[in-house]
């Protein structure tokens, strides 16, 4: 896989992961915790695909292959980092929503 194609796949998978994470957040806000957790699983799968590409590139560079770092790859890495952070934060927010829902159920008994 050439560097430009790898960067495009990184952007695509990272972008999908980020979108799925925010879909999960919106579901959690509606009290649909189970559905939100399923979306997070999908987001993790897209993140694994992106991370696999990144790892492959890092290994190639460690083996001595040289890459010309361009704006596209910087952009791709930015997408990856943002998607990872978004998913981690959304997971924590989902946990908070789940706890709040449980407390509300206890109060309304």
Task: Label the predicted regions.
Residues 1-109:
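Terminal alpha-helical segments
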């Amino acid at each position: 896989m050439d560097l430009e194609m790898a960067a495009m796949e990184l952007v695509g998978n990272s972008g999908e992961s980020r979108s799925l994470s925010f879909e999960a957040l919106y579901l959690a806000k509606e009290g649909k915790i189970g559905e939100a957790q399923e979306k997070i699983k999908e987001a993790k799968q897209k993140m694994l695909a992106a991370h696999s590409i990144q790892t492959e590139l890092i290994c190639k560079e460690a083996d001595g292959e040289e890459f010309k770092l361009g704006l596209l790859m910087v952009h791709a890495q930015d997408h990856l980092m943002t998607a990872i952070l978004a998913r981690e934060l959304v997971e924590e927010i989902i946990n908070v929503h789940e706890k709040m829902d449980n407390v509300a159920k206890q109060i309304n008994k």
